[in-house]
Every structure is written in structure tokens, then in C-alpha cells.
């Protein structure tokens, strides 16, 4: 069909379909996510459905994250007006609606990175709630790894933030746990890249 021909020319989907060589240019995790949902849609009878499922994933993640931004503003004691303004910024600015419908790695990465920044702010402003909370620190580490795996240069934002947080957090007992999160992010990111390149033989792409 015409739709199938269009998707064959779309970089990440064409790699999943075997039309182009599989590379890590767009990050392997992002390409896999595209591919899994595209193939699910195809299995259900429609390539368009597969693309729609990926866009729905982006929509759900970003809608929840942007809602968390508003909730965090409320937690900081911001007025209702500020909370409404934050909500309006995400809900009414047309750039966000267009961005959510864009089938690229940047959309999902943006949502998760905003959440990572939000959790970093939470760590620095409310450190007492993080003290001894392994589930919270584990989720923080997983989030950091995902940010690195969905965009190659994500590591250049995540690692400095973690390093700075480790030495500026007011609760000194949190320094080692945050450094442990930093170590986990580096191991997870480099480990995944090494596995896909050396074991799965997927050639590396440009940084971006």
C-alpha cells in the first residue's frame, strides 16, 4: 500500500523492516520501540495503527509528565494562577500538540528528560524524602538510563546533573546514594551500547 511504501522510507521503521541496515544512529532502544509497536499494528492489520500506537505512547508519557510539572508547582506552594499558567503552557501552546504527533526519538526523550529534571529538583528541595528510599533512587537511576538510551547526547545532560546533585544536596547522607545512581546510569548506558554494538553487531551512529 501507499502507507507501507511511505513507512519503508522512514529511517527507524525501514531499519526494523530490513529495508535499511540497522544502526545505532537513532539509538537502538528508540528504533526497537518504533519497531515493536509498528509490527504490533501490522499484526493487527494496519501499518497506520502501528504508528498510531507509538504516538499514543508518546502522548500518554508526555501528558503524565507535564501533569507532574503542574503538581510539582502546587507542591512548591505556587498559586492557583501559576498552576493554571503551567497547565495552559502545555495544553494550549500548539507547538506541544504538533510535537507529540511527531514520530521521532526527541518527543519521548523530552518527556522523560523533563521528568528527570523534575525528580532532580525534588531530590535537592526535599532530600529528607529520598533518604533511605531505595525504590525512589532505583526509579531515578532507571529514568536516567532511559534518558541516555533514547538520545545519545542525553548522557551529557544526565551525568553532570547527577554529579552536581551529589555534591550540592543538603542531606550529606544522600551523596553516596546519588553517586551510586550516577554509577548505575553510566554502567547501564555504556553496557547497553556495548551489548548492541559488540554482541548484536549493530554499528554505532553519530552522536545526537
Give the ranges of each region predicted by the language model.
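Short, small-residue-biased leader/transition segments that mark boundaries at the very start
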Residues: 2-7
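Juxtamembrane membrane-water interface segments immediately following transmembrane helices
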Residues: 12, 156, 177-208
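Specific aromatic-rich, kink-prone transmembrane helix
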Residues: 17, 68, 108-127, 140-144, ...
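Short hydrophobic/aromatic helix or loop-helix immediately within or flanking a transmembrane segment
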Residues: 22-55, 59
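Transmembrane-helix motifs of polytopic, lipid-linked glycan transferases
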Residues: 56-77, 115
